[in-house]
C-alpha cells in the first residue's frame, strides 16, 4: 500500500510538470500511472481505493504540501529502495528526465563531432543496452517463480520499462551514426 501511494503521488507530481518532460518520459509516467491504478484494484479487495485516495494517503502520511516538492529527495530514495528489492534500478528510470543531450558536450546527438567522443558515447550506450537486455531476461525468468500478484505486476512493469528504454537507446544510437 505504501509503495502504491508513493507511485501515485510521484506520477501525479510528474504529470503536473508535463512541460518539463520529454515525450518518452511522459509515456513512461503514464504507464506507471496505469500500473499503479491496476495495483489499487488488486491490492485489497476488501477495501478498494481510488487514485485520489492513494494520493491523499501519501500526502497525509508525509505531511507534504502539494504545491512544493521539498521532500523530493526522500521520495526518490524511497522509490529507489522499492526498486532495489528487485535488484533493478529500472523503476526510477522512467522518471529521470531522459533527454537527447550529451552530458559532456551538451549538444544534440546529430551535432556531436565524429571521432573519439562519438565512439565513446556509442560504446557506453551499447553497454547500457546489453545490460538492460540481460536485466529483461532475468526479469522474465523471475516471473516464473512469482506467487504474489503485486510482485508480478511490478516485474511486468519493470520489463516494460526495460524494453522501452532499450528502444530509446537504440534509437539514440541510430541518430548518432
From Swiss-Prot:
Domain of life: Viruses
Gene Ontology cellular-component annotations: host cell nucleus; virion component
Coiled-coil stretches noted in the UniProt entry, renumbered to this chain: none
Primary localization class, coarse: virion
Keywords assigned: Host nucleus, Host-virus interaction, Transport, Virion
Subcellular location: Virion; Host nucleus
Residue ranges annotated as motif Nuclear export signal: 91-100, 117-127
Subunit structure: Binds M1 protein. May interact with human nucleoporins and exportin XPO1/CRM1.
Purpose: Mediates the nuclear export of encapsidated genomic RNAs (ribonucleoproteins, RNPs). Acts as an adapter between viral RNPs complexes and the nuclear export machinery of the cell. Possesses no intrinsic RNA-binding activity, but includes a C-terminal M1-binding domain. This domain is believed to allow recognition of RNPs to which the M1 protein is bound.
Protein name (database record): Nuclear export protein
UniProt gene name: NS
Amino acid at each position: 500500500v505504501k509503495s502504491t501511494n508513493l507511485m501515485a503521488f510521484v506520477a501525479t507530481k510528474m504529470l503536473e510538470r508535463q512541460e518539463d518532460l520529454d515525450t518518452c518520459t511522459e509515456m513512461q509516467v503514464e504507464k506507471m500511472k496505469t500500473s499503479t491504478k491496476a495495483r489499487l484494484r488488486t491490492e485489497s479487495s476488501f477495501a478498494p481505493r481510488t487514485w485520489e485516495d492513494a494520493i491523499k494517503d501519501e500526502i497525509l502520511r508525509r505531511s507534504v504540501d502539494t504545491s512544493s516538492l521539498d521532500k523530493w529527495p526522500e521520495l526518490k530514495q524511497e522509490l529507489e529502495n522499492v526498486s532495489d528489492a528487485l535488484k533493478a534500478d529500472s523503476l526510477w528510470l522512467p522518471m529521470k528526465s531522459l533527454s537527447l543531450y550529451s552530458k559532456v558536450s551538451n549538444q544534440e546527438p546529430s551535432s556531436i563531432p565524429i571521432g573519439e567522443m562519438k565512439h565513446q558515447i556509442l560504446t557506453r550506450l551499447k553497454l547500457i543496452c546489453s545490460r538492460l537486455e540481460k536485466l529483461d531476461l532475468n526479469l522474465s525468468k523471475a516471473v516464473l517463480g512469482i506467487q504474489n500478484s503485486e510482485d508480478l505486476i511490478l516485474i511486468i512493469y519493470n520489463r516494460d520499462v526495460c524494453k522501452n528504454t532499450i528502444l530509446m537507446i537504440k534509437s539514440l544510437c541510430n541518430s548518432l551514426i
